[in-house]
Amino acid sequence: MELLGVRQPFGPQFQEEKYQMLELNHRLESYLGRVKLLEEENKLLREEIHTLKSSRDPAGQRKAQEEALSQARRMMEEAWRKKDCVELEVENLMEDMEKVSFQRKKVKTAQAEAQRKLTESRKELEEERRAQIWLREKVGQLEKDLMLQMQVHQENMETMQASLKQTKQVLMAPQRVQATSIPDLGQEYGYKAAQAWQEAANNYQKQVGRLEESLNQTKANMTKIYQEKRESQRQVQHLAKELESTRIKRQMLEKHAMQQREEQKEELQHLQAQVNTLELEKDCLGQQIDSLMLDRQHLLQVKMSLGLEVATYRALLDSEGLRIDRPTPNKTSSTVFLDALSKPTGIQSTSQTTAASCLLSSSVSTSHRSIASSRSLLTSAAPSWTLTRGTPQRPPSSTSMTEKTEDHISEETKRSAEESVDQLQQEKVQQDWTLESTLPKTSAEPKPELQPEEIKVEDEANEPQQAHMVESKTDESELTSVPAEQQGSMSQTPETKSWAGHFNDPAEVSEDGKDEDTEVSVEMARISHAPKVAWEEIKSAVEDEKDDASEMDVRSEIISESHTFAYGDAENDSNTLTSSHISQNTNALASSFLEQGTLDSASYFGYEATNENLMKEEELDNVSNISEEVTEQLNSETEAAIDSINEWDRQEESEPENETKVMTSYFEVEEGEMSINTDTKDKTEDDIEREELEVTEREILVQSAGGMLGVDLPNDTDHQDEHNLPQIELNEDQSEAEEENQKEKQCDEDDSPNISASLKTDPGEGDSYSQEHTLADTRPLIRYKSDEETSHHIGETSDSEDEKERIDQGHLNEKRFNTMEDLTEEPDMEVTGKMRLEDLVSNEEAAADDVASVMFQKVSGDHESLDVVVQESERKGNLEKEDSGDADNMRDNKEEDVSVFEQNENQQLTEHQHVHTEQVEDKPVHSHETQEHVNTEFSSTFSERSQQEQLEESSLTMFEDEAATKEAEDSDVSMHTNIDLIDSRSLESEINGQPDIMTSDMANSECNSSEDESPNASQCFQNTSLLAAATPNEQPLTFTNEVSKADYVSDNNDVPEEVLSEEKSTDEPKASQIDDLENFNIWGESTSISDAAQTTHASMDEHSSISPVNENLESSNKIPSVAENIFGHFEEHLERSVESFPEKEVTVMDFENNDLGEEFQSKQMKSEIHSFFSTSLKQDFWSEGKMEMAATYDPAKTEDLNQAMVFGEEWREIGVQSANGDTKEEMEILKIRDDKQKDGQPAQSKIVQSDDSADEGDSWSSGDE
């Protein structure tokens, strides 16, 4: 995990540099072309100049030309002069026009001003007129007032005169003077009247003056008022404008305020959402912290268990003596054991294999030690070239006790007697670290006191029996407090069973017989205070197999949080070690098992029959109560033990390579839950129920992980599913089906050869990684799948049955080479592809034998996948019986010949289809493994380094074409997506209706020639998962995209199981056979390229109901007689439909250009079938990368199975015909055209030719334009 994390940035950088280089190449090409063009032009110009200089013209002609030139110059000057004059005139006219325009503007302005003044004068005149009228009226009124006053005055005068006349004369006294005369009185009164009138006139005159003055003042006031009125109107208008602008501003401000409020509200909502998200993250982190704390406690308990284990082994080594007749320096032992995780006080069942026993001081040649770390088992061993399967012996099931476990311990066959002894390993045995000696008990050897019911078969140590049942009972109350010295003072209440079933190498069955099995005192298990399941790989000499006792076995605890397993491998001659054991675990499981105190440390290798005992509810009541004091005491011992284990592995890596080691089968060890009976009084019933629910949920999650991430995990996943099924009913069904097939498995197990060998990795890395993650790391650790894959090939016969069951249930997973499954539920496609590319590059850099495929796997809490797992288990129980017969036939056919690919191709293809289908999600399918196996079986000159380059280049090819593929998928949905079951069934019926002769011919001939020609013949089976995965939805050969198991199951949830089973049963043989035919040519020489191409088109046309290949793949004997007809069909059809290929068709045709070293010459070719032939990279990418033809898996990219890149559905013309089902008529037409084509153009029967037909291949690739 960490190593790949370091390499991770290499992928995008590599891609970026690649595209930069391509761009630079294009620019350089254009630049060079331009330079070449300019050079040609310069050359022509130089030639022209030279010609002109060489041809000297006459002098007269020169003068004439000069005169003509001077005339032309004069004319040009005149023209320029005229032009200048015209320009001057134009400029003058423009100036005049500007002046006139300016004057015109002035006149208009003056007219406007005069008009304005005239209007104002008219208004003033009107006002004056109105004032004059008013004054006239005023004058008239005053005149009337004057006349009225005059009349009044006249009347007063008359009144006064009348009154004077009426007055009486008064006698006057006589005057001295005589009275005046009458005329004098008249004058006097006249004078008085004139004077009075004058005064009145003066008064009226003054009054008129005052009125006139008041009138003038009123006029002035009126003028002022008028001006004020006009100013007020202007102010009113201005205020109205301001009011309008203010209103607009107010509206704008209101809108802005509203927007601000809305934005503030949205921001508050966003912040609230962020706060909620942070709260959720906080809760999640809190839960993770709690889980980490629980894991830490769990690991402390595991440390304690390791310390107790160390104490136990030290006590054993000190107490038990050497019981071997002679030293066994030639023997090598590789043992690993399973320790129940958090069960320091549980029941320990120890199994021993009898070959040699020794004390700490005995010299033991150990070529391999393996340590099982938490969630990862790193075994530094390499498989030998003859991989065989051992036959496990089924122990009798015991149902009388409440807590039982069966420990299937298998032994490796004995090694050669001449093997040299390395002194380093003698020193290693003496080191004080976690050892468990498999010391057989003899009568003369002192033994701890054992009760009869503890060990039933103790005296059978020296007998070569297949299995020994060891029943031991330990006291619940004394498990945690008994020291290492008190071995025989305990009472035994719970019962555990451990049986040491041995696995015989088929190569040595005749002379070896049965291995010796020994028993280990259960009191030793009591001392260790931790349940353990141990199995050993004893490598001893063939001639000393029965006589010699087993050497001391080094055992290391599996410190996994839930289900762990460990198994060791033997080294091969190349001193390369397989380090690919990865246990699939989750933190949720670890925490749940820690809470309930129950350790589910069942092996991933085992039988389903023990599920009844594994799922007992009593196991949930056990709690591991181990004091912290003991934990602190054992921490240092555990760390020292792990350090010594790592050192031992590194030293063993440098041991002599002259030992010929035989890779025995991996062992199917099924360790039931090691129920630890401790103090359970503090637990309440509510707590127990809660823990049971949690355990059930975790177990379902583990099962779903095994089902979704790998349909058919190689034996370990099978056991995990068996062990983790939450429902007892499902467990019982699986157990019954497994028990029915158990006898057949035991009979046929020795006959099934190994398909592939594990990849080899550096043991030092594995040990360091193991040491890091054993005590501290609570994360899901990486699982090296190559050993699981190897164990799948060499393990129990139940492998093939389980594989077939799961394939029949439709859990189809495409393969992935050297990739990593991301630790998230939905991994990113680019990241996954880049990690895959990183692995390929690292494999190319490393030595060919040091290739290690590392896969990250995390079983997350996928609650939504629980239903899928339940359906899987139900289908598994129903289909298991039907598949057992086929599995037995497959194993019987494998016995006669080491080459699995030559005989009974159909059945074996089905088996290998299961094998490689299972490997898709949970581990990278190691093409190197099968390559190694084939290289030993068949002599070959191909190197693994070239194959690594092939892997790298093929991955690059398919990554580049994924973009075009995506676009084509969107445009061609009708041709590519869901073909319903009706069309599929009709297609299957038509395909199955063809004769069986052609099928047998093609299938058998292809595989036989592949074995003879190609070292990678075994790789043809690795692509069967592709066909198998694409079969239910009629999508064969999914080459660049993959679909997860959960997606596929969800697609098939609404389909009846009968339809699915029938569809699968019809599709499995033909899919596997087509894949074999196709991949044979992928791995073959250039002589078989045409056959491969035609076979590829056969698989293309299979789902378009045109090609008869799939209809004829039922037997395997006579392909040469029929191959030309089939190829002709493909040829004719390709001529008609090759132009309609979408760019989505990727990668399969690439390998056909095996030895073509030149680029495609036509850009039109590239535009039409560019991505189909992957010409963006070198054509020989597929010739070099044929091992990984179909392994460009991307779990994130392909979300839907119907959107995978498939042939047949992308052929537009053929897709319509496939939907219509008119295939028979089309095949007849194709046959007729085939006959004509063979007569006319026999050379075109090959789709892509070898070296001598490159031009013809170009014409084919360009669509026969």
Curated annotation (Swiss-Prot):
Residues 403-418, 444-459, 784-796, 803-819, 863-897, 911-935, 1061-1070 have a biased composition (Basic and acidic residues). The keyword Acetylation does not apply. Pfam families: Filament. One of its GO terms (biological process) is embryonic camera-type eye development. Residues 1-16 are annotated as: Head. SMART domains: Filament (SM01391). GO terms for molecular function: CCR5 chemokine receptor binding; intermediate filament binding. Residues 53-64 are annotated as: Linker 1. SUPFAM superfamilies: Intermediate filament protein, coiled coil region. Residues 508-520, 730-739, 1252-1265 have a biased composition (Acidic residues). Residues 207-324 are annotated as: Coil 2B. Residues 943-956 have a biased composition (Low complexity). Residues 383-521, 667-830, 863-1073, 1093-1116, 1232-1265 are annotated as: Disordered. Residues 204-206 are annotated as: Linker 2. Residues 184-203 are annotated as: Coil 2A. Residues 325-1265 are annotated as: Tail. The keyword Coiled coil applies. Residues 17-324 form the IF rod domain. Forms homodimers and homotetramers in vitro. In mixtures with other intermediate filament proteins such as vimentin and alpha-internexin, preferentially forms heterodimers. Promotes the disassembly of phosphorylated vimentin intermediate filaments (IF) during mitosis and may play a role in the trafficking and distribution of IF proteins and other cellular factors to daughter cells during progenitor cell division. Required for survival, renewal and mitogen-stimulated proliferation of neural progenitor cells. Required for brain and eye development. This is Nestin.
